[in-house]
């Protein structure tokens, strides 16, 4: 195989996107959500992993957290990995990391990325399904379960446990 053949082969491979987010909670266990201005529903702080620059999912979650809410935090363990099929885009592998607990000073320090976000709020577990649409809602609930029961990373497909 020549170099050109190999390049053509690589270009022909299926495309998969990667996203990463941080799951932050307050002392009451409420989850920090952000409201994007470019789509319906709410989300965790996070976004697309810039894999073309060599960024890893963990680095992407930390970078996006800093960009979106102004907090630069070392992230904890990987809570969930979710393979998500979506309309009008390639599949995405979504990583959720433990962002840890936010105290009052952390909450006061939040500065939204106004070009992408409208607002933020803390949401109780029982209210998450009305804020987080589709697989994202299931993913966040599964990540909270991992934190609560101390189990290892959960594997998901479209927000549902597998294996």
What is the meaning of each model-derived region?
Residues 36:
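Short loop/turn segments immediately following the C-termini of beta-strands
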Residues 142-163:
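Charged phosphate-binding loop/patch that engages nucleotide di/tri-phosphates or the phosphate backbone
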Residues 30-31:
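Hydrophobic "anchor" residues
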């Amino acid at each position: 195989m020549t170099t050109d053949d190999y390049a053509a082969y690589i270009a022909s491979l299926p495309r998969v996107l990667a996203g990463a987010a941080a799951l932050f909670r307050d002392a009451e266990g409420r989850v920090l959500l952000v409201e994007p201005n470019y789509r319906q529903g709410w989300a965790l702080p996070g976004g697309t992993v810039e894999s073309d620059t060599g960024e890893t999912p963990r680095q992407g979650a930390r970078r996006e957290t800093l960009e979106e809410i102004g907090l630069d935090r070392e992230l904890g363990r990987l809570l969930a990995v979710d393979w998500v099929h979506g309309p009008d885009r390639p599949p995405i592998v979504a990583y959720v990391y433990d962002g840890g607990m936010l105290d009052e000073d952390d909450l006061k320090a939040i500065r939204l990325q106004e070009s992408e976000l409208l607002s933020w709020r803390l949401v109780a577990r029982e209210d998450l399904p009305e804020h987080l649409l589709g697989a994202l809602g299931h993913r966040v609930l599964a990540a909270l379960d991992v934190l609560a029961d101390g189990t290892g990373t959960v594997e998901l497909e479209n927000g549902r446990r597998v294996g």
